[in-house]
Structures are given as C-alpha cells and as structure tokens.
Amino acid sequence: MSKTYIERMSIDLRPAICGLGRQWEEMVPMRDGTRLRTLFYMPDTQGPWPVLFSRTPYLKNQSIYEYQGKIFAERGYGFICQYCRGTGGSEGAWVPFQNEKIDGVDALQWLQQRDYIESIGLYGFSYVAYTQLAVLDQLPPKVKTAYIVHFGTDRYGQMYCNGLFRHDIYTPWAKDNSGTNRILPYEAALDAGLYKPHIDADRVVWNLNLPWYREWLSHPDYETPFWKNSFWEELKAIPKKINIPVYFGCGWYDHHFGGMMCTYQSLSDYAKAHSKLVIGPWVHMKELCIEGHDTTDAYVGGIHGYEGALNWMDRCLVHGEIPEREVLAYGVGQGWRKLDQWPGSSKPLRLYLSEAGLAVQADCQESVRNYTYDPTNIIRTHGAECMCYAPLSDRGSVSQPNPNVRDDVVTWLSKPLNEPIVIDGAVKIHLSVSTDAEDTAFVVRLMEVTPEGKSYNIRTTATTLRYRNGEGRADDYTPDSRVECELTMWDILWKLQTGSYIRIDISSSSFPEYNIHYNTAEAWAMQQNPVIAHQQIWMGGESGSYIELPVE
C-alpha cells in the first residue's frame, strides 16, 4: 500500500524532545485593515522560540498544518500558519497570486514585533512556497532563512511551453481553487480542456466566472503587459535580490521543476554560495515515479521531508550557521550524488535524425519523414515531467508503447550503447520542419530503451510554430515553408546503461500535458474548428534535425 503524504514526509523523523504547548488563533491585520486568520502552535518550553512560518490558501490541507504544528512544536520550533486573503476564514477576496507580496510583507512585519519569536524560517511547499518567494526581497531582521519546495519564479515558463498551455496543471487547479467547495473528478475537470473555444469553458462547462483563469488563457505571448508590466516580472527579479541562505527542494518530475531551476540559476552570488539545492526522483507530492529503477533509497535520512527541513532550520535558526553551497541530486540509475554545481560539467553528444535512426553523423542527402496529425484523434499523455493532477501511473517516467503503434508518431533509435553514458543537464533539440497548416505543434520525447526492450520516457518538450523561437514571442509562419525550431528540455541526471538504445519520438499532441492544437493561426483559446495537418521532419544535409545530449 502506498504511503500518504504525511507518512512520506515523516520518514526518519527524529524523536520529540518536548510537547505541544499553547495553541491559538488570531486575526492578523494587513495595511488595508483586512484581517487574516492565523494559527499558532508553540512548544511547551520557555520561549522565545525559533519559528517556522507558512502562508496558504488551502483550507483542505488544515489537517496537514495541524500535524506540522504538532511535530515542529515537539521538536522545539513554533509553527505559524496564515490563510491567504479570502481563504480559510481570512477576510477579503480571493484572487490567486495577487495579494501575496503585500500581505506577506505585512504579516512578517507583524511577526517581527512579537517578543515570543526569536527567529523566523519561512517554510513553503507549492503555492505556499510561492507566498515565501514573493517576499524574499523584503525581509525583516528576524527572518534568517527560507525552505522552498516545488515552486519557481518563472510563471510564464510554468504555464506555457513554446505557445502550448499546460492543461493538466492549471485547468483542474483553476476549478479546485475557484472559491467553491465542489471538487470535480480528474476526468470531469479535463472536460473543460476539451471544450471549444476554451476561453468559454469556465462559464459553460463549470458555470463559474473566473476572469483570472481567462487571463492566463489569453496571454500565450510573453511580450505583453500581463507578463512584462506586472508582479510576474517582479517575481522573476527576486532571486537576484536574495541575501539569506535558502533551501531549494524539487523533483525531476515535479511540474515546477523548470521554474525552480530558473530561480536557482538566477540567485545572487551570495545566495547561491550559501544555499542548498536538492533534486529527488519524485513528482509533486513526493511520490516516487521512475519505473524500471529502484529509487526507494531516495527517502533515506528523511532528506525529502520534515527531517530534512528540521536539519536545515537547526543550522540556520538554532546554530546561527551560514551554510556553504550544497547540491545534492538523485541520478537515475546512480542514486544520490553530491555535486559541486548544477548543472555539472559535460560535453555535447550530437545525434542526427537520419533514415537509419539516430546517427553520430548527418546524412549527406536531405530526406523527410512524413505523418498526418488529426486534432480529433489525439495522443493521451502517458508519462511526463509536467503533470500534477493525472493519476500517478501517467506521471513521471513510465513504460512506453513500442514504436510504430500509431501512424502519427515517428520514431528514431540509436545503435545500442557500447558503454554507459550519463546525461547531465538540458537536452537540446534542433528541428527542421514544415507543414501545410497555418500553424501546428510538434512534441518531442526522449526515451531509454533497455537491453530487454522496455522503453521509459526521460524528458518531453513541445513547440508551436508561432512560438518556435523559445522566447515567448510570436513569429509568422507560411504554410509549406521549412523552418528551424530550437527546443530545450528540462535538466536531468540519468545514466543510460550499456546495451540500451536512445529513442526519440516526434508527434503533434500530448493531451492533457499540453492543449490540443487545432492547426490554425487563431489564438489557441479561441480555436474551435480542427484542421488536419500534414507534417514533415527534415533530416540530413546542412540543416537537418538533431538532438544534443550533455554527457559526463
């Protein structure tokens, strides 16, 4: 039987050293007079205490916060949890992400004045991590560190992949956090993702009015005021202003992984020199998710859970330590590795798409691989790094179908490896493509095929032709013209064994990981008339398609 979230997080948790003392609630005032419901849990020892502070919109998780309050108090720490504006008994209107900066700053200033608080460590997971990231450039003196898990500061990159909206994450999340108590089953929530035009889905399918969700749908272009002249742009700049040690925790197959890597790479020199990065083999709720490999040792020592948080807080809050930089990454096929930096040092291995498969040299003559993409006959996502609500069996790295199961998926295989290779960093793809449609999508999947013939997905990425530049800026496309697409997959640390094959699949759909592209140039959320597209992948010659692996 699989463990619950609390059970997973409590693996190897140290024994209690005291009891849970006083518990109480207060309505803490913000600068505009709005009061936010705040829960307090303190040890039964003499204060003042080091305190962990969280801000959350998730009333459904109150039992988790109560458990955290108990276990942290029993180990000498206070725990304070505040509900975001308009949630969990707090006053005001709930608009996701909008008020967390100002309210977070006000809450910390209020805590700074409490004499029972000795020091503060910010503690956040997912949206709760966002509420902490939002204030890391405006901290009062008592805040000494932050423990940030599964969130990042590149919101645009989290929501869109080269013009494709990440339905599995943000469509069910919008419904579940719409201010109603009605939680839909996953498949029912995805009905909205299939509705055309999708811009009307909240009102027609859910009978709700979610203007903030429609704003997300309406801005696939980064070069707009919605992204550039808003707090989202301010959020991207915060890592450069951080001047405290921060623990960053993420999973290879968590949907916030890409955003967290952007955050980590953007840190100020001081913050990077004194922060810790931990990357594990799990999805969002810390479930292990890599088939074909035994990763149970990933939980040893509780590095992923409450014990890992306490170890970090001990160093920064109790002992007053300023840690030196640490990078700890779980290599698939290797186990935990201590690294000097991330990504590590690597050299590029280029493999060309050719008539014979993946080759170390490009074919001299140009050739083309064709397939037909029908948006009414989509591929359902099975295995992915950027999914959250799908069943666990469809997330992470899972066994894949054999090649040639579908006519609209084309496959290239390398020769069997003569020795192991380790992918260390971001795989890059150069696609040379054309289509007879006004616009279309291409989905690229990298896999390992084991000597036993089992295929496992490693990384996936995708692009539309309008957003093929990778910069969030639309480019025109003329049907039947040949264009070049530069794609970058998320980082990975993965050892391919001797005798394995490298496999690349290219298709044009992966729903609900990405929205269904209907092969028109109309804004994606307005599209409602599917068009069949005839796709070409160009190989060989001077500008044929290839992949580039960073290998140790």
Protein language model features and the residues they cover:
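Cap/lid segment of the alpha/beta-hydrolase catalytic domain
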Residues: 44-112, 288-298, 438, 444, ...
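Alpha/beta-hydrolase fold nucleophile elbow
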Residues: 115-126
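N-terminal cap/lid segment of alpha/beta-hydrolase-fold proteins
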Residues: 8-45, 413, 417-419, 477
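Glycine-rich nucleophile elbow surrounding the catalytic serine of serine-hydrolase chemistry
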Residues: 124-134
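Active-site-adjacent alpha-helix of alpha/beta-hydrolase-fold enzymes
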Residues: 258-275
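Accessory cap/linker subdomain of secreted extracellular hydrolases
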Residues: 74, 137-241
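Short beta-strand/loop motif that positions the catalytic acidic residue
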Residues: 242, 248-250
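C-terminal, loop-rich substrate-recognition/catalytic regions characterized by aromatic stacking residues
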Residues: 9-10, 199, 287, 293-552
